[in-house]
Amino acid sequence: MTSADPNRQKLTQLRKLLIQHFSLDELRVLCFDLGLEYEELPGDTRTTKMHGLIEYLQRRGELPRLLNEAVDHRPNVAWPSFSDGSAAMQKDAPAGTPKSFIHEKTGLEMLLIPAGEFLYGEEKELKFLPNFWIAKTPVTNAHYAKFVVDIGYKPPVTWWENGKYPPKLANHPVVSVSWYDVVAYAQWAGLQLPTEQQWEKAARGQDGREYPWGNEWRPYCNTLEAGIGATTPVGYYSPFGDSPYGCVDMSGNVCEWTYSWVDEKEKFCVLRGGSFFENQEQSRVTYRGDDGPNYRFDFVGFRVTAYFSIFDF
């Protein structure tokens, strides 16, 4: 008798858990988070559309994306793992894929974070993420101004006057933006906020280091120890403070909103990275801050990500 295919069993388990824990409205949100159109999924019931979603992402080798979103929404559910080294899950970027590109609408430089396993969290759990892009820098005042002007969105209250930022702060991270503000920016740009896992992999690479540059504290970032007491231009500490992938300011300068909630109650959103207002301990890449999605602070900003599959080089 042939033994059962473990991946098929995992797919069945995944489908059952998604149907059990996600309502129809939550499935719509899940599709939005994944950059997919709910209406374009095959079928006309929650069950058939869930099946279609799994099949679509499986064909593209992107089931880890679905699992990451499911874990973010329902962290207490025992989700199956597909990070078993199978070829479908370990898809390399096609030959000739650039390491970076300039996102046309925003002007942000996006860096490729290659697919693979990495050590995650304080406990250094082995996790897998597919290819994705992340902004090299936090979104600056100049970047954010394009969004404000384009759709008439309300400008940040800190530093901006008459709807404009001070010219000397053009290349500083935009601050005093709520989680809802930055989600609106990402939607306008056709991008996303990073999940906790995406943010952390981009910040520490694969080896589980404590800071973007290594395991030991170094004065390579704008934290409380620097004594500046305000934001600095993005990349001010580059290249010494850069992450293994070239991301800047992932320790210090401003805390960054992620798309992840602290828990399934969805009352507080996770902040990562520390800021000029916080010390070296709070600027480790595993440190988790949190706040309500309506709050705005002059030490909190954000950066954005893009799913690899939506770009064709």
Predicted regions and their residues:
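Basic helix-extension-helix modules of the SAP/HeH family
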Residues: T2-A87
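Feature responds to low-complexity, polar/acidic, surface-exposed segments characteristic
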Residues: N7, P42, P155-L169
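Short, P/G- and charge-enriched loop/turn segments at secondary-structure junctions
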Residues: T97-F101, E122-K124, R288-P293
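A short glycine-rich, aromatic-capped structural motif
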Residues: I102-W159, V175-Y180, G252
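Functional-site microenvironments in short loops/helix caps that host divalent-cation chemistry
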Residues: L119, E161-G289, P293-D298
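Acidic glycine-/aspartate-rich tracts in secreted/extracellular proteins
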Residues: V139, G152, Q206, S260-D263, ...
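Short, structured beta-strand segments at or near domain termini in extracellular proteins/domains
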Residues: D298-D312
